[in-house]
Amino acid sequence: MKIDDVIQTSLLYDFYGSLLTDRQREVMELYYGENLSLSEIAAEFSISRQGVHDALKNAGRALHEYEQKLGLVDKFQQSREAIGDIDERIEGLMEDVQKQEALAPAEVTAELQKIKDIIDKLEE
């Protein structure tokens, strides 16, 4: 499994883990949180490695289905990107003021409008 997949699964788990069954949560915690192998988890629950694999697959599928229906992770990621964009724009305006560079009122207004547009988009 690629690192991006692990990160995405962990993020999905953070948002939707409480919606999983107890067994799915336990298996996910041991595999992703404690970094145990399939064999170690199988021994812990007295099931086969295939059983652990299936539990992980089913849990992953459930997490992705929750995301498709609810979209909370996507909204969270969009919000983080928007906040970063707003921060950069405000930082740029502050630097211009500190350098005492004269910005035309139209430039300041345009930049503030871009920031407002980003905020409005977040509220949708």
Model regions: which residues?
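Short amphipathic alpha-helical boundary/capping segments
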Residues: L11-L20
